[in-house]
Amino acid sequence: MNYDYLIVGAGFFGATVAERLAATGKKILIIDRRPHLAGNAYSYTDQETGIEIHQYGSHIFHTESDEVWNYITRFTKFNDYVHTVPTHHEGKLYPMPINLDTINLLYGKNFTAEEAKVFIAEEIKKDIEKYQIEEPKNFEEKGITLIGEKLYQAFIKNYTEKQWGTSAKNLSAEILKRIPVRFDHDNRYFASAKHQGIPKAGYTKIVENMLNSNNIEVRLNTSFKDVESEIEGIKVIYTGPVDELLNYELGVLPYRSLRFEAEWTNDDLGHAVINEADKDISYTRTHDYKYYQIHQPKVLTSKKSYLCKEYPADYEVGKEAYYPVNNADSEALYQKYLNLLQERYPNIILGGRLGAYRYWDMDVAIKNALDLASSILKK
């Protein structure tokens, strides 16, 4: 096949661009260095229990975009799962994001919504005066000004420090735009999502369906370097890290990584995910994937569970880069790489979470891919 485009990376971004271009007759080669499709959303079914295992941690599809929902539902059917995430703190489970129940449980009160609003506002005012915060200088001060010290210390501080691998005082206040606090009993994690659910056939099947075209060739276990000699003169959409593509010539862009420890057990988490807010527990989340399969009662009531603990990890070259560490220095370095890329590879378009150096949810990746494909086809 003579290709019109090479797409590097078969996650949702790459697969969406491939599907859209192929639908107009373009010939596409899409590659991925992993042995599977779907990127970090990759899932597979355990044959004994029927549990759909999310290889790289829980993925819950949610979006406010009708465009994205109408597109993705061409390739799968979703169940009606609505995500809730209790947070474990000092032996108790609290609803998260923070709501009226969280506040009452933590403070041992029985506030009404209006009473809680007044109380939290007073707590914030008192703590701002206590720490003499005029303008928050770091993440910790910003957190205190948003929700008060007690809520911040209980649910935000330690979780954040585990996630980022540093003191909250070393993190920029700019990272923390807002902390949602609901003065009602709504415990939905994605309360603003117009659409959400779990694909009934798993995430990998979505991407398989997207790439099921005579105009698309898929090669797994294949890196960009493996095919570079074959694709001279054609356009490339590259969804990997730009620093790796350019051999780290300007230095390594900062990322965070993850590691997972999983085991089959007869124990039961009781929830799809529980967050761990306390410092003495080094992992941030535990996953019990069977709780996503509300459309399969037999799986949901299985006596076995595949419990997976998620540990944040420092990133180094050779590890998987899961999400970028965005700050002024990293943004400046990324921009330098973009300039160098334009000089070396003017035929390459960057995209996807790693290529764009952005922390994107699945729906945002798909939306950006739809926009890119549309702009390409208009030329």
Predicted segment positions?
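Active-site/ligand-binding neighborhood in enzyme catalytic cores
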Residues: 90-234, 246
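Dinucleotide-binding Rossmann-like beta1-alpha1 core, especially the glycine-rich loop
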Residues: 48-123
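C-terminal catalytic lobe of FAD-dependent flavoproteins
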Residues: 320-379
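Glycine-rich FAD pyrophosphate-binding loop
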Residues: 22-47
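Short loop/edge segments at beta-strand edges and connector loops
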Residues: 9, 82, 218-222
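N-terminal Rossmann-like FAD-binding beta1-loop-alpha1 element of flavoenzymes
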Residues: 3-30, 373
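Short, solvent-exposed loop/turn segments at secondary-structure junctions
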Residues: 12-14, 35-37, 49, 101, ...
